[in-house]
Amino acid sequence: NGRAAAAINERKQKGDFLCVICGRLNKPLADAVGRDVMPVEYGIGYTGTFSNYRVFESYSHMHMVWAAQGGFDPDGKFYDVAIPNYFDSGDYPSSTEKGDYFLYLGRLMKRKGVAVAVETCKRLGAKLILAGQGVKEVKGNRIECVAGEVFEGDHLEYVGCVVGQQKADLLRNARAVFTPTFYVEPFGGVAVEAQMAGTPVISTDFGAFTETVEHGKTGFRCHTLDQFVWAAKHVGDLDPWYIRQRAIANYSLGRVRWMYQEYFEMLHDLWGQGWYELHDDRTNLNWLCRY
């Protein structure tokens, strides 16, 4: 932080933004840079925030942090916003012809809900491909995780950690992607990546999934095993083209950049008349639209 602060102080101009992540770990940097630069925390999916200007990954997480920091009945903050993570749609080719498997992509740990995906596919007699970190040992169809969980069954296949083309192919060819996270997910990028590839998502019904998964359109949000099983049986009824187009409309680079544009213009006004600044040339308020 000390070296970074020295370098920034040599180059900064009044009115610059200091965009930081990692929360309170970067507070010493913001303090050292001074008041003529505005510290902005972006991509917040954690709780240890410090800045007065914050961009959260979802409304769900923003509200949770407000409650954690402000008590049971907190006031909102005008310069806190929810702007989702962004994706390059070119990284996620889509396919209307799906394979014979379901996919779980993420850390293999209890709180990620892996057991829900395993049990759902077991009840259906369907293949489940598991990909991600957290596996200690694989012996045949027995998968032992670092955290202690053991998953076993003829319907399971573990393919390790995947990136690039292998990841893209797994996403676009899956019948659906499971994201049955137990904790209140700040964002859950895999759910959006799957939809970018035109693949339905089967998730829990809390956290950011209530914002990213359009129930009955781009996937299903579930509470019980019965609901997870029904969802897995009916994901083929959903339209891959619609799923992909909605993801692009809401989470592509071209979309999210306008949300940041509006937000930084709001902050820039604070160097002038602040909250009371008017813009007679404004033509829309589309930055908060969802498509």
Task: Please place each PLM-identified region on the residue numbering.
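Catalytic cores of nucleotide-sugar-dependent glycosyltransferases that transfer UDP/GDP/TDP-activated
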Residues: 1-291
